[in-house]
Amino acid sequence: MALLQIAEPGLMAAPHQHKLAVGIDLGTTNSLVATVRSAHTEILLDEKDRPLVPSIVHFGDNNEITVGYEAGELASIDPQNTVISVKRLIGRSLEDVQARYPNLPYRFEASENGLPLISTRKSAVSPVEVSSEILKKLTALAKRRLGGELQGAVITVPAYFDDAQRQSTKDAAKLAGLNVLRLLNEPTAAAIAYGLDSGKEGVIAVYDLGGGTFDISILRLSKGVFEVLATGGDTALGGDDFDHLVADWITEQSGISPQDDKQKRQLVELATRLKIQLTDNETVAIQYQNWHGKISRNQFNQLIQPLVKRSLISCRRALKDANVTADEVNEVVMVGGSTRVPFVREQVGEFFKRQPLTSIDPDKVVALGAAVQADILVGNKPDSEMLLLDVIPLSLGIETMGGLVEKIIPRNTTIPVARAQEFTTFKDGQTAMTVHIVQGEREMVADCRSLARFTLRGIPPMAAGAAQVRVTYQVDADGLLNVTAMEKSTGVQSSIQVKPSYGLTDDEITQMLKASMDNAKQDIDARLLAEQRVEAKRVIESVLSALSHDRDLLNDEELSAIKKALVELDKLQQQNDTLAIKQGIKDLDAATQEFAARRMDKSIRSALTGHSVEDI
């Protein structure tokens, strides 16, 4: 059966007409835009034939907005109205931003929902608005170079961006007038670029160290399928941090501290130039105000060594998650301008025991991979056999009785994905159920991260355990989570889209994973105890309900024995002895065996009253 293609009026391309689509690397330090022309990927250059557009926005007089190199030139002159590295702020709360980056030169205000607004000469602007200005610049550049309107764009984001950060990126694109075909993880985009160019199969590590973020992905390439086995990284680690370490070193060596935001910016710019010069030189001279000195590559290596080590710890964890060893990695792809630092390449090579791949410019590889994906999604490669599988970083689950976590989608599950599970009511006549969505690897809700709650109402009153509620978790290709709960007999349902106001750092994810391993035995013991307590409460509720209806079926001695077993089990379920609670449940079950049989006989007699054998 043929597919029917539907498009908005005026947007339908003529048969075999090449549709204009771009891949955008919206970077912390620099951004790029790329496309596919005549089956070749290429970076689109600006009017001065430069591939990079600095991710810098200046807000000037008369609402004049400048983006890129020109904005960068104004950064040291007018730092409070020049926004740099806005990617670090997007999707975060003001409280989070101020805690992470206390030395930013901006004046912040809080929006109604607690998100940061940057006070500028123009007005108070959000990180989404600032990002949209960068995207507008890239869009205009692409239209000028391609000579037409864009059908869509694939925009890359760090693998550890959470729902709020991804949604904010989409919002920025919408403000810029872009049709987002898909958000794509940066390491995955790099894998696409290298996978198509080399066609190699096997395990690949993508080491992506940019200006402000670090990502490590372990992928398997097999028969055209890119599968992300595991991801890791740090949303607050990059070349910017190298610059600040050098700036701090200069301050310490010279004894000269910057006196204002302008001097701070000039010092960081000097540190950046020194870092770049040390890529090709063993020693570089420094002139800072009236101080003259020099810095060697070895001194620079010592400064950045703790940060490089931090990135390699993430690599080790990702390999463990992927269940592969460094020896099994066939290729190591280097991505991001900061991977030009010789010490970084050397340390990564030693860790993976092989020479890293740098055949594609590390600054350009992500944008080129995004362009390939955009070309496919817009329909220029309908017969492409390439399949792309991303993963979620932490398990998604639901709270059940007793504060237990039932995992619906385990971590490192490929996305998009949908999983459903059925739950039931705990009490007789229960007409509502609260769905508590949690994230993490621990067994108890108290040890996991709460994402959201919503309530399903309108459940028909039934006996405990009779209602059937189907809970569905859906994670789309952009990593956004939708949860729906539906009562099956009535079809009544409720749903929610999870958009946390701010997300987890890699350190927090690391702590959550480490805690789950360190506390594995205690967690299992706690879960077994909680499960027995829940079962004890269920049995007690059930017996009390039965006694309220059919106490007359028991003599005094039998009633006394059941009550004694009830009291004993109630005491036990408040203690911490799992085996004792289990035995208490067995004792109550034994005490109520005859009672249960009599109730069954009574129900059968009631059902048969007024009916003949022929009726049955």
Curated annotation (Swiss-Prot):
<dbReference type="InterPro" id="IPR013126">
    <property type="entry name" value="Hsp_70_fam"/>
</dbReference>
<dbReference type="GO" id="GO:0016887">
    <property type="term" value="F:ATP hydrolysis activity"/>
</dbReference>
<dbReference type="InterPro" id="IPR043129">
    <property type="entry name" value="ATPase_NBD"/>
</dbReference>
<dbReference type="InterPro" id="IPR042039">
    <property type="entry name" value="HscA_NBD"/>
</dbReference>
<comment type="function">
    <text>Chaperone involved in the maturation of iron-sulfur cluster-containing proteins. Has a low intrinsic ATPase activity which is markedly stimulated by HscB.</text>
</comment>
<dbReference type="GO" id="GO:0140662">
    <property type="term" value="F:ATP-dependent protein folding chaperone"/>
</dbReference>
<dbReference type="InterPro" id="IPR029048">
    <property type="entry name" value="HSP70_C_sf"/>
</dbReference>
<dbReference type="GO" id="GO:0016226">
    <property type="term" value="P:iron-sulfur cluster assembly"/>
</dbReference>
<dbReference type="InterPro" id="IPR029047">
    <property type="entry name" value="HSP70_peptide-bd_sf"/>
</dbReference>
<dbReference type="GO" id="GO:0005524">
    <property type="term" value="F:ATP binding"/>
</dbReference>
<keyword id="KW-0547">Nucleotide-binding</keyword>
<comment type="similarity">
    <text>Belongs to the heat shock protein 70 family.</text>
</comment>
<dbReference type="InterPro" id="IPR018181">
    <property type="entry name" value="Heat_shock_70_CS"/>
</dbReference>
<protein>
    <recommendedName>
        <fullName>Chaperone protein HscA homolog</fullName>
    </recommendedName>
</protein>
<keyword id="KW-0143">Chaperone</keyword>
<keyword id="KW-0067">ATP-binding</keyword>
<dbReference type="Pfam" id="PF00012">
    <property type="entry name" value="HSP70"/>
</dbReference>
<dbReference type="InterPro" id="IPR010236">
    <property type="entry name" value="ISC_FeS_clus_asmbl_HscA"/>
</dbReference>
<dbReference type="GO" id="GO:0051082">
    <property type="term" value="F:unfolded protein binding"/>
</dbReference>
